[in-house]
Amino acid sequence: MGILSERDRAAVTKELERLAGPVKLVVFSQELMAGDLCRQNEQLVREVASLTDKASVEVLNLAIDRERAQAYGVDQVPAIVVEGVRDYGIRFYGIPSGYEFANLIDAMLVASTGEPVLAAATRTTLATLAGDVDIKVFSTPT
């Protein structure tokens, strides 16, 4: 049995039709640290990716694939890296369920284009920043 209902699968499929290019979802798991959560996270990601031919999934083990985890800056599980033609630094820690699920789909859409949807004024302001900014959003399960 899947995580997504038929209604949700239909809605997500429609949203994913907007993908402009390929998206890769790199899932980091580790059975010993968070087995149930990692399995649910992987199942959710595989279900989402199965709804479009533009999404692929790669599952890595945090302990075994340490070099890859370090390269992505991932040090917790479950984790999802959302990549388009390159790594834009989009990470999800924990299972993106509830309201966070829509953010996963939005992240896939943004990664597929390589261009965030920002107002011109926002782009101008961001261009004045002297360096990279690390933005973290924390949420509680819904």
Where do the protein language model's features map onto the residues?
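Structural micro-motif
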Residues: 22, 66-91
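Contiguous, structured surface segment used for ligand recognition
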Residues: 45, 69, 104
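Long, charged amphipathic helices and adjacent flexible linkers at domain junctions
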Residues: 111-129
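Thiol-based oxidoreductase modules, predominantly thioredoxin-like and allied folds used
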Residues: 53-65
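N-terminal beta-loop-helix "entrance" segment that forms/cooperates
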Residues: 34-39, 65-71
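Non-catalytic, surface beta->alpha helical segment in thiol-disulfide oxidoreductase systems
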Residues: 81-116
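Local sequence-structure signature of Cys/Sec-based thiol-disulfide redox active-site neighborhoods
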Residues: 7-52, 127-142
